[in-house]
C-alpha cells in the first residue's frame, strides 16, 4: 500500500471518529438541555376545586427546602381536615414535589390537606439530609398549624419510591426510641 493511500485511509478514519464524538456530544448536550427544561417547567394542577400554596420555604439552610400545601378550595375557616405529608421519589438523586401535585390534588378533593415536601438531592447532599428536612417540614407545619385547616390529630405520612422509604423510616424513628437514638434524632 502506498503512502498516499495510507494517509487517505487514516484521515478518513480520524474524520469519522471526530464526527462520531462531536455528534455524541451534541446529542448529549441536547438531552441534558431538554431534561433541565422539563425540570424548570412548572407542573400545573389545573384543578378548580383545589387551592395550592407553592414553594413555601421551611428551612433556610439547605437547598430544596420548599413545600407545597394543597387544600380543598371551599373549606371554611373553622373546619379542620386530616393532613397528608408526602415526599416524592426519584432514587434520591432526582425528582421534584411538583410532579406529584396533579395526583395529590385528586386526594385533596376527597377532604384532605396535603403537604408535599421537597428535599435536597444526592449525591450533593448525603443521607440522612432528606430525613432532617422532612422533620423540619413537619415542625414548620406544626408551628404554622393555625394558618391552615389542619387537624394534627389525623396525620398520614407517605411517599412514592425513595420518598416512601424516607417517610417509612421517619415514622419508624417516631415510634422506636432506640432507632431514633441510633439515628441521632430527637422527637420534637
Specify the residue positions occupied by each region the protein language model found.
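N-terminal cap/lid segment of alpha/beta-hydrolase-fold proteins
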Residues: 32-79
Amino acid at each position: 500500500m502506498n503512502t498516499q493511500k495510507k494517509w487517505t485511509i487514516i484521515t478518513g478514519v480520524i474524520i469519522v471518529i471526530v464526527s462520531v464524538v462531536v455528534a455524541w456530544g451534541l446529542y448529549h448536550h441536547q438531552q441534558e438541555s431538554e431534561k433541565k427544561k422539563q425540570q424548570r417547567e412548572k407542573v400545573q394542577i389545573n384543578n378548580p376545586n383545589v387551592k395550592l400554596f407553592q414553594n413555601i420555604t421551611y428551612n433556610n439552610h439547605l437547598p430544596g427546602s420548599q413545600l407545597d400545601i394543597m387544600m380543598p378550595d371551599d373549606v371554611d375557616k373553622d373546619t379542620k381536615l386530616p393532613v397528608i405529608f408526602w415526599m416524592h421519589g426519584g432514587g434520591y438523586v432526582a425528582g421534584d414535589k411538583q410532579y406529584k401535585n396533579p395526583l395529590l390534588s385528586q386526594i385533596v378533593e376527597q377532604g384532605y390537606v396535603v403537604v408535599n415536601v421537597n428535599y435536597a438531592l444526592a449525591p450533593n447532599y448525603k443521607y440522612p439530609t432528606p430525613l432532617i428536612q422532612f422533620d423540619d417540614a413537619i415542625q414548620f407545619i406544626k408551628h404554622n398549624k393555625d394558618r391552615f385547616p389542619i387537624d394534627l390529630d389525623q396525620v398520614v405520612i407517605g411517599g412514592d419510591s425513595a420518598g416512601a422509604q424516607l417517610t417509612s423510616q421517619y415514622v419508624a424513628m417516631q415510634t422506636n426510641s432506640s432507632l431514633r437514638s441510633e439515628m441521632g434524632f430527637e422527637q420534637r
